[in-house]
Amino acid sequence: YFWIKPKVTEQNMKHKIIKQTLLTIGISLSIVNSQLSIAQRSLGVSGLLNIPSADMQEDGTFMTGGNYLPQEMLPREWGYNSGNYFVNLTFLPFMEVAYRCTLLKVKSTGKWNQDRSVSLRLRPLKEGKWWPSVVIGSNDLLTTGELNPFLDSGGNRYFSSVYAVGTKHFGFYGHDIGVTVGGHVPFRSRSENKGVFGGVSYRPAFLKPLEVMAEYDSKVVNVGVSARLFDHFSLYAYCYDFKTVAGGLRYELTPRPRAFRSDEVRMPWDGRVELVLYPQITLNNSWLDKIYGAVINIAPAVEARLWKGAAFTGQVILPVWNNMVGQMDYIRAGVLTLSQEFGLPGGAFGRVTVGNFTNSRMGADLKLRYATPDDRWLFGLEGGVTGSSTFYEGKWQVSNWKRVSGAAEVRFRERRFNMDFNLGVHRYVYGDYGVRVDCIRHFGRTTAGLYAMYTGGEANS
C-alpha cells in the first residue's frame, strides 16, 4: 500500500480538527451511562444538532448549558465566533420552554453584551406505534416593544422561526433510528430560517449513550455525535456544512414530583427563635458596557415567633462582591418586619405587616385571604402604603409613606400536574394599573413558573 501525505492547507487543518474532536468524544464514552438525551443542541431545546425534532424530554426535566457557535452558522449581524448559554424546562409533558442568551458585541463600544430570546414548543400529538409525534414550536418569536410577531419592524429577533415538525422512531435488535421531517412557517420575510429541514439519528444497541446524527437544516448539511456523561451531563460536537466545528455541554436534571403544601402558613405560638443564613445572588442585564450587573450577599436573619400569630424578622445584608455602584457596597438593613395574623368569620384570615421590605420599600401591608375547604380555590385582597428605603454614601435614607399599592387575586389549584394558576389585578407603587397571570408548577423541592403581565400599555412575560 502507498500513502501520499496531502498538502497542509487551511481546509485540511479544519478536517483534522473535526476528526480529532469526534475521536475525543468517542474515547470519552468509557465513562457514560445508559440514559438517553435529546436536544436541538445549538439552541438548547429538544431536537438534533441545528434543527428541532418532535421528541420531548421527560416531564419536569431541567437543562442548562452553553454552546460554541462559529460565525459561519450565525446570522449576518455576527462577523465573529460567539456562543450562547441557556436554561430549559419541560414545564408540562407536552410543553417545553427555554431562555437563551447569545453573546454579541456592541458596535459603539466593542464590548460584549448579549441577545436574549425565548423558545416555546408544544406537542399536540405523541408518538404511537403507527404515527409520529408532532411538535409546533417557535424561537425568538417576540421582541421588546413589539407584540405582533408577523411584523418585520421592531427589535432584532435574529433567531426567529416558527415551525412544525414530526419525528418517528424505528427499533430493530435494540438499535434505534429516528427520522425527523419539518418545515419553517414563513411568518416574516426577515427571518433567517426558511424552508424544509430534516434529519436522521442513530443509537446503537451496544452503546446507548452515543447518538450519531446527520441533518439538513434548510441551508446546509451537518453531521455530528453526542454522548451522555455521568448521568447528568451531555457533550456534543458536529461539523457544520463540512467547513467548521460547533459544540457544547449541558447539565440535565429531572426532579421528583411532590405533593402540595399550603402556601399560606398559619403561625403557631411556640416561642421559637431561629437564626437563618440567606445567600443572595442577583443578576441584571440592563447595561451596554457589561454582560451582567452581579451582586453576591450573605444575609443572616433572626426569625422569631412571639405570641399567637405574631412574628418578627430582623435581617442584615453583608456584601460579598458586586460590580455595581450605590448601596450594594454597604452593610445595610434587609427585611425588618413585625407581622400579626388574625382570624375572620367564615374561615378567612388576614395578616398585617409593618417594617422594612424588599425592593427598597418601607411601610405597612395588609393581606386578606379565603381558601375553600378543599384548598382548590383561594381569593385574596392586598393593600399597602410605602415609601423608599435606600442606603447611599453610608446613610440610611427613607421617604414619607405616600405610595399606595394593592391587588385583588384569585388562585386555582390543579392537582394532576401540581399546578397553581393565579390571576391578579394590581395597582403598582407608582400608580399604574395592570393585570398579571401566573402559571406555577411544583417539582420536587423546586417551584417554577411562567407569567405574563400587561400594564401601562406594555406587555411582559
Features from the language model and the residues they span:
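Hydrophobic, lipid-facing positions within transmembrane beta-strands of outer-membrane proteins
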Residues: 60-62, 83-85, 116-120, 160-164, ...
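Transmembrane beta-barrel domains of Gram-negative outer membranes and organellar outer membranes
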Residues: 39-162, 170-171, 175, 204-210, ...
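Detector for outer-membrane/organellar transmembrane beta-barrel domains
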Residues: 153-217, 312, 344-347, 359, ...
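Short beta-strands and strand-coil junctions in structured, solvent-facing domains, enriched
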Residues: 143-144, 172, 222, 358, ...
